[in-house]
Curated annotation (Swiss-Prot):
SMART domains: DnaJ. This is DnaJ homolog subfamily C member 10. Residues 235-350 are annotated as: Trxb 1. InterPro entries: DnaJ_domain, ER_disulfide_reductase, ERdj5, ERdj5_TRX_C, ERdj5_TRX_N, J_dom_sf, Thioredoxin-like_sf, Thioredoxin_CS. Keywords: Disulfide bond, Endoplasmic reticulum, Glycoprotein, Oxidoreductase, Redox-active center, Repeat, Signal.
Length: 793
């Protein structure tokens, strides 16, 4: 017998069925999308190096060249190649972590190299522990850490780079501990290599904080590389004798520095001069290195009970003629690296701060503090003992604190595992926990940046939810590589915005409740709190773009439109006004990716094109009325004419600020003047006006890209300088006479009224603002010269 359901029961059951269907559908959908991390067999915490190594291993196994009989080989390889292309890129990795593959619709990729490339050219130095592969985000911090770096800029396809690789590996092992050996893959980091002036491969440079980079021009043998490197190593070896021995020892001991002395006698072996120099460089600032010739200093050696060649380390305060020699370390090795490790292992540990004096000590000095729980884990890395010396000039003291002696103190600082933090001289109120690599150069960079920045570690007690001052808060997880990459940029941004905005970081693995309260679903999520207003940052991980975001919050470059204001400002715009409008929906991932680019574009078009956006989730009916069928929908509204309602839709693949700007400028009426051979001669060469000329060819792609930029320049300098264009395909002879050898070429022709002659100057910049600034500077110089000439008359 059937059972009749009431209307309410029917609706309730129908909702349940629909919900179950949706759950099953989503499970199937999720199951079909393979996780990029799983594809490569790495964890979400994997470093760039680990991702490269995992991809290379898979590439050599799955490449279509090695699987010619597998019809699925191409498709399978595309999947892992796509995963690698996304995860190796910091910005794409952040998008993927936050939105999944939907957030990558503008970055499709799809190309890969041959099997031989992955076997022989890919990740040349990833398996060499002595060589550190540096990426753009960490390069400056590394080479400015205070250590000496020798960096190899190479390209994977360069045969000379591969010829050098075995020598570079041997060289790195030879000088390990003496200086840092780095490598930069210019195939992956083209921008970094261009910024460093690298235009040939391999290029080898010495870097040290406070000095200009030095390029190596010698032959590429290990011996020549070692010789060149040693020229830049700070090494002083003192010959000790009766006249200077006592004073040298006492002066060093008074400064807390010990001596490593090799005694050379007839019997046994003492260290060679080359080994002594290397040890001096390796122990620079930690231990003085000296030698004594016992053949000429026989009495002094006997007084020290030295009867044969030997090497000994005398720590500060050691009794030199103590026959028990309990405090003196005698070394049996003749190898510089072995001696270095033994000496540095015997150096005293950092000062242990007590719970009783901690607050007072941190209130009067800047500190880098290691937190440990009972056993000091840092003693496993003797290299870290260099920190005290390398941070001395920055007035940063280095110490340690045992959390097992006062658990409450560490708990209040949210320190629950061995870690280190910088305290900025204000007690325990202002501090920042280190989340980077536990290696010397990374800790040095962190300490120097942190003490001079204005970023603080946040928790429930100091979270600025209701603070009257605006705050930028970075919600992050320490295991997330894009999060760690963002932290140095936040420090830079905090200095640029000091006094306008406070900066803090919140570790969501420690403060899960706070992160859930603000619905943090991906890391890093950066939010600006301005009393009741909350704004999420969606831009790239750079201090400059964070600065742009804050400036845009204070002075918005994009008009938020409503149906009413759209009608008033866009539909009924003035005759000479133009608009670009973004129709978007907040839930749409491509819209979210577009928004920071849209704002960046708007700032560059101020005064030329009005830029707006309209929320189609809030104003759904209006967007439907405007026939908006997809998001984001970008439209250009040209100057009003007698024609019906008119606009142009953007159909380009790239939605970055540059591409959109070029597209919008292309609709503006031309301000520059097209010149013929006759008008070029009459108006430019024989006239009395300043001119800037774009020499171009219609078939030239870069010329087409530059054309809107030149029109923007023409508008920026209108009234001061005339702008003209010469078609070098139509008027080849004119361009030849003007000395044009490439397209586009920009030249500034300026008229010197005092001499009644024209001068010309080639401009090798392609940015309208930069060209305008250069021209204005030149005009000011000409004006000042004119004034001086009048004064002289």
């Amino acid at each position: 017998m059937g059972v009749w359901l009431s209307k309410d029961d029917y609706i309730r059951d129908l909702k349940r069925i629909i919900l179950c269907f949706l759950i099953v559908y989503m499970a199937i959908l999720v199951g079909t999308e393979q996780d990029f991390y799983s594809l490569l067999g790495v964890s979400k915490t994997a470093s760039s190096r680990e991702i490269r190594q995992a991809f290379k291993k898979l590439a050599l196994k799955l490449h279509p060249d090695k699987n010619p009989n597998n019809p699925n080989a191409h498709g399978n390889f595309l999947k892992i190649n796509r995963a690698y292309e996304v995860l190796k890129d910091e910005d794409l990795r952040k998008k993927y972590d936050k939105y999944g593959e939907k957030g990558l619709e503008d970055n499709q990729g799809g190309q890969y190299e041959s099997w031989n490339y992955y076997r022989y050219d890919f990740g040349i130095y990833d398996d060499d522990p002595e060589i550190i592969t540096l990426e753009r985000r960490e390069f400056d911090a590394a080479v400015n850490s205070g250590e000496l770096w020798f960096v190899n800029f190479y390209s994977p396809g360069c045969s000379h780079c591969h010829d050098l690789a075995p020598t570079w590996r041997d060289f790195a092992k030879e000088v390990d501990g003496l200086l840092r050996i780095g490598a930069v893959n210019c195939g992956d980091d083209r921008m970094l290599c261009r910024m460093k002036g690298v235009n040939s491969y391999p290029s080898l440079f010495i870097f040290r904080s406070g000095m200009a980079p030095v390029k190596y021009h010698g032959d590429r043998s290990k011996e020549s590389l070692v010789s060149f490197a040693m020229q830049h190593v700070r090494s002083t070896v003192t010959e000790l004798w009766t006249g200077n021995f006592v004073n040298s020892i006492q002066t060093a001991f008074a400064a807390g520095i010990g001596w490593l002395i090799t005694f050379c006698s007839k019997g046994g072996d003492c260290l060679t001069s080359q080994t002594r120099l290397r040890l001096s460089g390796m122990l620079d600032g930690l231990v003085n290195v000296g030698w004594m010739d016992c053949a000429t200093q026989d009495n002094l050696c006997k007084s020290l009970d030295i009867t044969t060649s030997t090497t000994a380390y005398f720590p500060p305060g050691a009794t030199l003629n103590n026959k028990e020699k309990n405090s003196i370390l005698f070394l049996n090795s003749l190898d510089a690296k072995e001696i270095y490790l033994e000496v540095i292992h015997n150096l005293p540990d950092f000062e242990l701060l007590s719970a009783h004096t901690l607050e007072d000590r941190l209130a009067h000095h800047r500190w880098l503090l290691f937190f440990h729980f009972g056993k000091n884990e840092n003693s496993n890395d003797p290299e870290l003992k260099k920190l005290k010396t390398l941070l001395k000039n920055d007035h940063i003291q280095v110490g340690r604190f045992d959390c097992s002696s006062a658990p409450d103190i560490c708990s209040n600082l949210y320190v629950f595992q061995p870690s280190l933090a910088v305290f900025k001289g204000q007690g325990t109120k202002e501090y920042e926990i280190h989340h980077g690599k536990k290696i010397l150069y990374d800790i040095l960079a962190f300490a120097k940046e942190s003490v001079n920045s204005h970023v603080t570690t946040l928790g429930p007690q100091n979270f600025p939810a209701n603070d009257k001052e605006p705050w930028l808060v970075d919600f992050f997880a320490p295991w997330c590589p894009p999060c760690r990459a963002l932290l140095p940029e936040l420090r830079r941004a905090s200095n640029l915005l000091y006094g306008q905005l406070k900066f803090g970081t919140l570790d969501c693995t420690v403060h899960e409740g706070l992160c859930n309260m603000y619905n943090i679903q991906a890391y890093p999520t950066t939010v600006v709190f301005n009393q009741s207003n909350i704004h999420e940052y969606e831009g790239h991980h750079s201090a400059e773009q964070i600065l742009e975001f804050i400036e845009d919050l204070m002075n918005p470059s994009v008009v938020s439109l409503t149906p009413t204001t759209f009608n008033e400002l866009v539909t009924q715009r003035k005759h000479n006004e133009v608009w670009m409008v973004d129709f978007y929906s907040p839930w749409c991932h491509p819209c979210q990716v577009l928004m920071p680019e849209w704002k960046r574009m708007a700032r560059t078009l101020t005064g030329l094109i009005n830029v707006g956006s309209i929320d189609c989730q809030q104003y759904h009916s209006f967007c439907a009325q405007e026939n908006v069928q997809r998001y984001p929908e970008i439209r250009f509204f040209p100057p009003k004419s007698n024609k019906a309602y008119q606009y142009h839709s953007y159909n380009g693949w790239n939605r970055d600020a540059y591409s959109l700007r070029i597209w919008g400028l292309g609709f503006l009426p031309q301000v520059s003047t097209g010149l013929t051979p006759q008008t070029f001669s009459e108006k430019v060469l024989q006239g009395k006006n300043h001119w800037v000329i774009d020499f171009y060819a219609p078939w030239c792609g870069p010329c087409q890209n530059f054309a809107p930029e030149f029109e923007l320049l023409a508008r920026m300098i209108k009234g001061k300088v005339k702008a003209g264009k010469v078609d070098c395909q139509a008027y080849a002879q004119t361009c030849q006479k003007a000395g044009i050898r490439a397209y586009p070429t920009v030249k500034f022709y300026f008229y010197e009224s005092a001499k009644r002659t024209f001068q010309e100057e080639q401009i090798n910049i392609r940015d309208a603002k930069a060209i305008a600034a250069l021209i204005n500077e030149k005009l000011e110089t000409l004006q000042n010269q004119g004034k001086r000439n009048k004064d002289e008359l």
